[in-house]
Amino acid sequence: MPRSQRRRVLVALPTAWDGKQLAACRAAWEERFEIVFGEPDDESCRADLDPAAWVEGYAAAAERGDGLDGVFSSSDYPGATLAAALATRLGLPGPDPATVLRCSHKYYSRLAQREAAPEATPGFWPVDARRPGELPEGLPFPCFVKPVKGAYSLLARKVDSPAELAAFLARPEVKEYVGGYLRLFDRLVAAYTGFELDGGFFLAEELLSGEQVTVEAWSRAGEVAVLGVVDSALHPLTKSFLRFDYPSRLPAEVQERMAGIVRRVIAGLGLVDSMFNVEMIWDPQSGRVSVIEVNPRMCGQFADLYRKVDGTSGYEVALALAVGETPRIERGGGRHALAASFPLRVFEGVRVARAPGADDVAAAEALYPDALVWNECSSGQELTDFLAFEDGRSARYGVLDLGGPGREELIARSRRVLDRLGYRFEPAAPPRPRDFR
């Protein structure tokens, strides 16, 4: 198709996964779409970014230039909200920014979940992190606490007593996170919502247990369609994510119940014309299905798992939705029976003595069809400040996405790929102070 006839789509605040995943499925979209990667990218976005200026800058460029036919973002924060604001400003398909923030702000999201699916919503209580000595009455212990606007699993953990919770909220890392990293979130909340609770709150929740999954789906024209259910394999002690498996091994009846809950929750939140993923947990002892959280954007890390098994990448779905089309997928249309994403982790502080170069990554990917390798560290880097990484008890330094005939073979392939990459680590010094600017 001539360039002038292709649909022009902006990827707002592109993430590390966007370029890699879009390149992997290029043959499926390059004749129909022209991709524009926005600035800044997700990693370099600062907390002092002006949301209104960003939206108006891209809107003005679109109106005086080649225009835009769609916009989306796989960036959880702030990309999903900014993409929604720009789509609204230009009259393009997409959710409105207030709805994205309602999904993203864990307290207001829980309120909507409790209204739509009370049986799947655990008890929850807002806690002001700026007043660690003033805890809400009736808060049960042990409980699970997390920021109302999280980043991966950063600063999310189980606490066993009021004293432990107060001490945790008083930590410098919490103050830096709330007062620094979430400054932009507070501006987004002020600009697009009437929320009374800003980013300075944490949410204390009833403990959940069971088998954890991610239900990824999309909402289009009032209908919700499930793209896939991905199982989470957790470290038995740290509860770090060790592997994500697609398709899920949960009983079909449980997956159907989850899909029904997701449809009610998304309708209650009012999210339309968007991909999203809902983290859920099933307790096989009680049969209870619970919502962990709603993320109003695609999961870039999982996109090629669907391509490996079903033949359609999550990015193909995102592009279709961005221009107002209904995505179409064919179950089992890929070349692999199973696919898995392997986060690579260290559980003790280390210095990266050797990280793979581009040639190492290419050689590792060449070992197996459709293999994708993402390296997240560099030689000489220290992986010691675990509070800056997801669960606070490990550090992720890369990701492997692989397809194969079965789980044991996938695990064996991951070991061979990791060996070929040639990472080397050595003990490291204690962590230095962090900067949340």
Residue ranges and their predicted role:
Residues M1-T99, D128-G133, G324, V346-E348, ...:
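ATP-binding N-terminal substructure of ATP-dependent carboxylate-amine bond-forming enzymes
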Residues D48, W54-G65, A84, T88, ...:
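N-terminal beta-alpha lobe that positions the nucleotide/phosphoryl donor
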Residues A120-P122, P162-L208, S240-F241, R264-G268:
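Conserved ATP-binding module of the ATP-grasp superfamily
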Residues V148-S153, H336, R393-R396:
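Short glycine-enriched loop/turn motifs at secondary-structure junctions
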Residues R157, E205-E206, R396-G404:
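Short, well-ordered beta-strand elements within core beta-sheets of diverse protein domains
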Residues P172-E173, D198-F202, E206-S248, R257-V289, ...:
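Phosphate-binding core of ATP-grasp and ATP-grasp-like enzymes
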Residues R257-N277, P296-R354:
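Active-site "cap" helix and flanking loop/linker of ATP-utilizing ligase/carboxylase catalytic domains
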Residues V346-Q381:
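Glycine-rich active-site loop/lid that clamps phosphate-bearing ligands
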